[in-house]
């Protein structure tokens, strides 16, 4: 008969320590906001605000041959300011805790956790700034996104939201939407439907999308790629580069607000890039380390009414 010398409820079990060998960090959405913004630097000795100045328009007129030009106009300028504020995150690790804990890399891992927290706030602040565009809002609460919403919003941005005084922006135009809306957008591009003839559109504002087959519509490489890779294959629709960010807030009614905007219209001003600053100088804390990650930045809009349109759509969790 075999003798069990160690194990749960057996001999010597009190002598078996619990040793953890796998240590993992919870993952946050890394986000895309800095990649779709115009980045600027508030350098030392430049004050507390970064300014962008733009000059107004003047109008050209027909004049009669030989007549004196009497059309003098005032040239005006407008300054838009962006004032960074500090952001910080802190954890204090006790000296005795670090000596006793099973994770030999606790200090380094904690530093990465703090950096992740800073990055999460930075990106979330950027998604919140999208609501400050003041062009025409596309969609509404409960509306399911479609390709036409994206291309329509992009078409407006391409003329600066004005037919009377077109103001085409420089650079790329982006759409930042929630991944759950992008999932539906991708399904409508295949398109998925609940009947073979394609009479019912894919997507519902309660998450019951019902797409069980492929209906007639667009075909080719993009559709095939979307079927394989989902919304990550969206790419560009109507000259608008579609990006997703799960840090966009979804309200109690399953709706979110993102934007279709010109990169020129979303501003990120950095004063201090995030830095990890460990401090163990306080001897009364007996070996404790105070870990601080801090930086200084601000998000803002430029030409908010011309260069961006908010978009509000459903972001229900899929149920079918």
Q: For each of these PLM feature ranges, what is it?
A:
Residues 1-81, 312-314, 318-320:
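N-terminal "assembly arms/tails" that initiate or stabilize quaternary assembly
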Residues 60-63, 101-102, 184-187, 194, ...:
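Short helix/loop capping segments that flank catalytic or ligand/cofactor-binding pockets
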Residues 75-100:
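Short acidic, glycine/tyrosine-flanked loop/strand segments centered on an H-E-D-like triad
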Residues 97-168, 310-320:
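Alpha-helical scaffold segments that mediate packing/assembly in large oligomeric complexes
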Residues 134-230:
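Extended, solvent-exposed, turn-rich assembly/linker loops in the middle of proteins
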Residues 180-184, 234, 248-250, 283, ...:
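Short, catalytically relevant binding-site loops at active-site mouths
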Residues 225-280:
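Glycine/small-residue-rich hydrophobic helix-like segments
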Residues 273-320:
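Extended, compositionally biased alpha-helical segments that mediate assembly or anchoring
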